[in-house]
Amino acid sequence: MASYEIFITFGIYLVFLMAIGVYFYSKTTTHESYVLGDRGVGYWVTAMSAQASDMSGWLLLGLPGAVYTSGLTEIWVVIGLALGTYLNWKFVAPALRVQTEKYNSLTVPSFISQKLNDKKGYIRTFSAIVILFFFTIYSASGLVASGKLFDSLLGIDYKWGVLIGGGTIIVYTFLGGYLATCWTDFFQGCLMFFAIIVVPVAAYYSGGGIDGISTAMEAKDISLNIFKYTKVWSLPIIISGLGWGLGYFGQPHIIVRFMSIDSADELWKSRLIAMIWVFISLLGAIAVGITGIGVFTDISQMGGDAEKVFIFLIHKLFNPWMAGILFAAILSAIMSTISSQLLVSSNTLTEDFYKHIVKREKTHKEMIWVGRLCVIVIFIIASVLAMNPSSKVLELVSYAWAGFGGVFSPVILFTLYKKDLHWKTVLVSMIIATITVITWKTSGLSNTLYEMVPAFVINSISIYLLEKFKVFGNNEK
């Protein structure tokens, strides 16, 4: 059972997040403000909220655990994510900000549909279905992580942990909408950044410095040479790892941040901040795993679970008050991603379904409350999926990333930069990519090559060939 200091720290943290939602409740007066913050978010908040909603619990739990177990075998994923982050900010962010405002688009599906002149809304509908499916699963996986965190840290029953963590998210997302989500992500991103620096520094000295850590690594036969285990047949592993970066261009909960910044001219500042955050955070996560080897020479000291190395280092090295703050950073990593996914899903239901199904004129107040109700509905569905602590839903996180990356990434790039792209070309290519992701995963081929890579390639080739040979003719404007 955790000490009262940790309970108090967690309580203050959760109340603080809900207070942000209450604060922005009165500032959310229009549908666009609830969905996109009236496109008035500053560059600091844009950068930090995008990165906080991106990394999730993998940054503080998954990556350090992988490094603790097998050294730098995950380095290709890290490199892929860093490159993908930069390219996303460099090539997608400015164009998406300008063009979504031009077409008055509040969601990714509506932008693609409007720019390509899809008058029937087929692309919008198909895109919305894909987003709702994968984000409901994605959100459920975050709630599973939340429940397990409350259970392992505070001794709170798993199901109550799901409801407490999710309930807090619901309060500030329901009340404050997009602005509340961005600002909570901003503070959570700062807390994550603080933790990822402080913990490995303390662990370095506790583990005996370079000599102590090196000795422990040699005893476990772990090397920092990224090519030690790289053979000719490792090429698919390298491609799969680097391929994670391709997914960034199509992640709705990340690229929506580009759409809401107050000026496209400020995006270079956001890019600089984001890249510094990502670079240091990824290095810090790797350092947690490496220094953890020096502190815990045997995995049994952590209950046999390498992914808890960050948690056990905090328990061992810090007093309860500081531990509570650092544990809150782990919860931040989980909550920042869930809130963004819930809001994007809600906006998809509201903007891409309700708005077009209900033909009569709708007020801003009505659209805001429909959005709030959608947040609750999606949360309930995700919570039901997450109620089983042994749920396999966590395994679907990479599946969801592949779904968005394979289906949306090429489409976003072509839509932004290809002139006279036919909407039928895009719709057919999206369907082909979706089938590719599902088939590749269910056939077991993903054990050899990450399913997003073939989906991305096939999607891109499909768009190129269909347009080159004008299969659907010229797009009507």
Predicted features and spans:
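Membrane-embedded helix-loop-helix hairpins and adjacent transmembrane boundary segments
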Residues: 1-477
